[in-house]
A protein has these predicted regions:
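A polyampholytic, Gly/Pro-enriched intrinsically disordered region
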Residues: 27, 49-54, 321-326
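Short regulatory helix/loop adjacent to the ATP-binding pocket of P-loop NTPases
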Residues: 12-28, 40-46
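Conserved beta-strand scaffold positions in the cores of enzyme catalytic domains, especially
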Residues: 26-30, 301-303
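Short glycine-/acidic-enriched loop or helix-start segments at secondary-structure transitions
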Residues: 14-17, 41, 87, 202, ...
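Interdomain hinge/linker elements that couple catalytic modules in large macromolecular machines
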Residues: 41-230, 256
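A cross-kingdom feature that marks ATP-driven nucleic-acid transaction machinery
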Residues: 3, 155, 161-165, 169-328
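Structural recognition of the conserved hydrophobic beta-strand(s) that form the central parallel beta-sheet
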Residues: 3-9, 30
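Conserved nucleotide-binding/hydrolysis micro-motifs of P-loop NTPases
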Residues: 9-14, 33-38, 173, 197-198, ...
Length: 328
């Protein structure tokens, strides 16, 4: 096998390599993960039902909503990488599926080291879950690599973004105008292009992620606040729709805290705002303040959570599994 095929990301695709092979398993590695519709088709779930639910515009009841959220959490746990999906369809347990995902991450790291043998590019990739877990206003290169920021580190970041293994989300400094025109290149967050790989990277400090952890994830009983995991899911879904990722953050008057709206997308001359909550409970202070501040510029404001569809004043409540239909 030619050595230039032994790669895992678009770093190799840029050299016109289309079929990437995992040397040990002889598995083709497709860079782009399956979206949720493709995953449902591959696993025998009825994606068309979600379209019907969306078209109805009505709540579906707690039992059905719980079932559909569990189905979506399976997608989050497995991810959309074809090898992981194949392992799931073939009845592998989640620890075995996790090992497949670790192989894919290892291939990415091999690609990263072809560009940067020091390991800094891999460190930038590995730091993404921790950055999001801290709920920081932006991704900091210096936190990831432990060194002073410099031009070389920024070049590695752009190489990482070009590899399509990560998704950049830029702060829009003024959502009143075109999001692209107000993109702050120095203020951004990073997500992974596949949420299944994100789950594995969250627990990469252990040799394998145990079935028990996956069982708790599927039943929504992990002890940690997993809002950042659901943010990654939303980032992936928005990207699949062909849109760039934007968010907006601004200081809270008279406080050291700040407001933040997780995602913004353009709709005609206006914008739709999205706040992501793993639970759906809470005051939703940021998006309400955003609606007050930018009332003339907003088309719709959504709270995306695990709860059934509904409405709170001018805030539309929607479950995660309906997001693809909201952003078409």
């Amino acid at each position: 096998m030619s050595s230039d095929l032994e790669a895992g990301s678009l770093i190799s695709i840029k050299k016109n390599v289309k079929d990437i092979m995992i040397p040990s398993e002889e598995m083709k590695l497709e860079v782009y993960p399956m979206d949720y519709e493709e995953f449902c088709d591959a696993t025998g779930n009825n994606y068309g039902l979600l379209q019907q639910i969306y078209d109805s515009g009505a709540a579906i009841g707690q039992a059905t909503n719980r079932k559909l959220m569990r189905d979506l959490r399976i997608y989050m746990a497995v991810g959309g990488m074809p090898q992981a999906v194949e392992a799931y369809v073939n009845g592998k347990n989640f620890s075995e599926i996790d090992m497949v995902k670790r192989q894919i991450i290892s291939l990415y790291e091999e690609d990263f080291k072809k560009i940067d043998a020091s390991g800094r590019m891999s460190a930038l990739y590995h730091a993404i879950p921790a950055h999001l877990a801290k709920d920081a206003r932006k991704y900091r290169i210096t936190t990831a690599i432990g060194k002073r920021n410099n031009t070389k580190a920024e070049e590695l970041l752009y190489e990482l973004i070009d590899s399509k293994t990560v998704l950049p989300c830029y702060n829009s400094t003024n959502p009143r105008v075109n999001l692209t025109d107000t993109k702050d290149f120095d203020s951004y967050k990073l997500y992974l292009s596949d949420t299944g790989l994100f789950v594995t990277l969250m627990f990469i400090d252990r040799p394998v992620t145990e079935n028990d952890i996956y069982a708790k994830l599927l039943s929504d009983k992990l002890p940690a606040n997993l809002g950042y995991l659901y943010e990654n899911l939303v980032a992936q879904m928005i990207t699949v729709s062909g849109r760039e990722l934007y968010y907006h953050t601004w200081d809270k008057k008279g406080s050291t805290h700040y407001y933040e709206v997780d995602f913004l997308i353009s709709e005609g001359s206006k914008i739709n705002a999205f706040e992501v909550k793993s639970s759906g409970s809470g005051k939703h202070e940021s998006i309400r303040e955003f609606c007050n501040k930018f009332s003339q510029n907003i088309s719709k404001a959504y709270l995306i959570s695990q709860k059934d569809a509904g409405k709170e004043e001018n805030l539309l409540l929607e479950p995660f599994y309906l997001l693809p239909f909201l952003i078409k």
